[in-house]
């Protein structure tokens, strides 16, 4: 990666910190003239203490910089939270968890990667490890960890957090199989001399291979104009199940959902990740790598709901929102809607 090698000539001072939840981000409208059922997520969120769901921010776009993308995604986590905070809590959840609403959602803070806008040796790797520790803490307490990126290098940190948890809970001869479902225009299995936002699933494949574990990876929304022939060759070698953006538009829903359900049936645990550049730039202008075509928001939301109802999703994340290029908070609002879909479906499926 030319940009990575060039950037190494400069010395960059870095800092990786895990900041606690900033509850001032959780604000919204008041409803003094409505009934108690006029509830919003900002009224339920608390600092994370073993709630059903733990939100963790990954305020890092060092991987995007290394991947020659446009930086700015590290500013996204608090803005996605704020957009989500203003959404109403649906009636089904209020009824099902009556008297227990404070147990639904916790904010576990943010992992900050301060790289002074330059290439920083090992900074991304340190941030991924610290993020993995936070993820593992949520999963070990029985919660669903949902990460808010940041660049898609969050994916390797998410996987490490899940792996760390499974290693600490080993009590059987056969390890549970992990399946990864990624909504993304890019395969993110690049070869590089450094980790980037374009390498996480290759890194995961290599990690699993080193531990004699299978690599189960389904990528939905892949664009033939966003991946080289070399990447498609590698996907075939790794046994990646590829569902293209054109498939998502032109193939019947039943055909596609059967493919995804068959994938889910083959594994014990699902890691679900959404790179927001899978959607058209007309819908989400604020991303690191905007898509000319993309897949429909309704399709993504419906498929996410299908995957979540399996009960196998133990970790999820949303990546690549870049507020620098957003318009009227449009992209953050779409991310918040998908976050709400994950949250609602997980809670209704428990």
Stretch-by-stretch model annotation:
Residues 2-350:
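Conserved alpha-helical scaffold segments that buttress catalytic/binding sites
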């Amino acid at each position: 990666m030319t940009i990575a090698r060039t950037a190494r000539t400069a010395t960059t001072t870095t800092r990786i910190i895990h900041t606690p939840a900033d509850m001032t981000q959780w604000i919204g409208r008041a409803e003094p003239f409505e009934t108690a059922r006029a509830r919003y997520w900002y009224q339920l969120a608390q600092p994370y203490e073993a709630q059903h769901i733990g939100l963790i921010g990954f305020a890092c776009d060092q991987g995007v910089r290394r991947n020659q993308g446009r930086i700015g995604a590290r500013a996204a986590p608090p803005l996605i939270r704020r957009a989500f905070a203003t959404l109403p809590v649906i009636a089904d959840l209020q009824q099902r968890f009556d008297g227990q609403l404070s147990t639904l959602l916790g904010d576990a803070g943010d992992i900050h990667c301060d790289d002074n806008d330059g290439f920083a040796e090992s900074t991304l790797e340190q941030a991924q490890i610290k993020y993995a520790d936070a993820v593992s803490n949520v999963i070990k307490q029985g919660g669903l960890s949902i990460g808010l990126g940041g660049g898609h290098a969050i994916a390797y940190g998410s996987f490490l957090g899940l792996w760390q948890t499974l290693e600490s809970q080993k009590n059987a001869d056969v390890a549970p199989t992990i399946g990864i479902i990624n909504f993304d225009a890019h395969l993110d299995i690049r070869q590089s001399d450094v980790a980037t936002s374009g390498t996480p699933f290759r890194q995961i494949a290599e990690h699993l291979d080193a531990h004699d574990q299978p690599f189960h990876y389904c990528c939905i929304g892949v664009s033939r104009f966003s991946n080289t022939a070399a990447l498609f060759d590698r996907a075939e070698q790794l046994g990646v199940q590829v569902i293209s953006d054109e498939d998502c538009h032109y193939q019947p829903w039943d055909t596609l959902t059967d493919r995804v359900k068959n994938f889910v049936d083959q594994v014990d645990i699902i890691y679900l990740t959404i790179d927001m550049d899978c959607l058209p730039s007309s819908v989400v202008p604020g991303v690191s790598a905007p898509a000319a075509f993309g897949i429909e928001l309704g399709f993504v939301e419906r498929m996410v709901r299908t995957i979540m109802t399996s009960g196998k999703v133990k970790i999820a994340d949303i990546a690549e929102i870049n507020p620098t290029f957003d318009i009227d908070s449009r992209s953050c609002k779409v991310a918040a809607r998908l976050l709400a879909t994950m949250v609602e479906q997980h809670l209704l499926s428990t």
